[in-house]
Amino acid sequence: MALIIRSEIDKATQAITTALPWRDYYELTKPKVVMLMLLTSLIGMLLATPSPAPLWLLVLGNLGIGLCAGAAAAVNHLVDRHVDVKMARTFHRPVANGRITPTNALLFSALLGGVGLWILSSFINALTAWLTLASLLGYAVIYTLFLKRATPQNIVIGGLAGAAPPLLGWTAVTGELDGHGLLLVLIIFAWTPPHFWALALYRKKEYAKAGIPMLPVTHGDSYTRLHIVLYTVILIAVTLLPFATRMMGYCYLVGALVLGAGFLYRALKLLVSKDPKQGLETFKFSIIYLMALFVVMLVDHYLFPIPVYGV
């Protein structure tokens, strides 16, 4: 029955995408992931200065960053096509499914990346363009080609590339590196392991079938649950740094502590739970947590500004 349903889904998908091939290329960019990255990039832009940056800079900066993120996602589709066909979550992807050829995926990625870097270097600044290129290569090459299949710490090491967008947004506005911008990167860097390991617990069998050495596959569920708790504690500590450095005020401190307590509760619940769906619930909550934390940052930054900006 499952095979029949899967066959019918494939037929329906093929019929739709044959009529609307642009949808396949849109899917190639992982739009949901890119949108999350652009939200964090926008947060970086809005936090970089006491008053909002010009609209044209926000639009062009995020356009360039978004195109480069889409380029990296397309490379991920290309490299992972043999793995994607083994996983229920990804077997329908356009390259894995054969709807887009590897050559066309590579050309599409090169086009997006080239245009994105041109926008950043021509209209924003060279620093942002170079940092975006480094992030693109870090995700598409270092993580996707090597780390993902090499070590269960793939998410920890490779998470730095995915944590870069707020810094890219920050440098797009200021044109220079800043410790506060790096703090935003550190927050996402600490958030990434518990976020993805929670999903890996739920998708453990699929990762094992595909040969991806995610932590639950190599070290077991109990070990992974414990590390989710430990990294959540680290995350909470990291989120206090913006207050400690006077980047943020008391409004942020209260919000960060409340949200952190909620995340820790979820992590502890996952630690003792035997329900496999609890991993998925923790994964979903982690996304809400990150967005809520950044909203609190914006509220604190604009409604309760500290007297002396910076350190």
Swiss-Prot record:
Molecular function (GO) terms listed? protoheme IX farnesyltransferase activity
The main enzyme category here is: transferase
Q: List, alphabetically, the Pfam families matched.
A: UbiA (PF01040)
EC annotation? 2.5.1.141
- Gene Ontology CC entries for this record: plasma membrane
Q: Which GO terms describe its biological process?
A: heme O biosynthetic process
Record field: catalytic activity: heme b + (2E,6E)-farnesyl diphosphate + H2O = Fe(II)-heme o + diphosphate
NCBIfam families with a match to the protein in the record: cyoE_ctaB, PRK04375.1-2
Give the family per the record: Belongs to the UbiA prenyltransferase family. Protoheme IX farnesyltransferase subfamily.
| PANTHER family reported for this sequence | 4-HYDROXYBENZOATE SOLANESYLTRANSFERASE (PTHR43448:SF7), PROTOHEME IX FARNESYLTRANSFERASE, MITOCHONDRIAL (PTHR43448)
**Name of this chain's protein:** Protoheme IX farnesyltransferase
What gene name is given for the protein in this entry?
A: cyoE
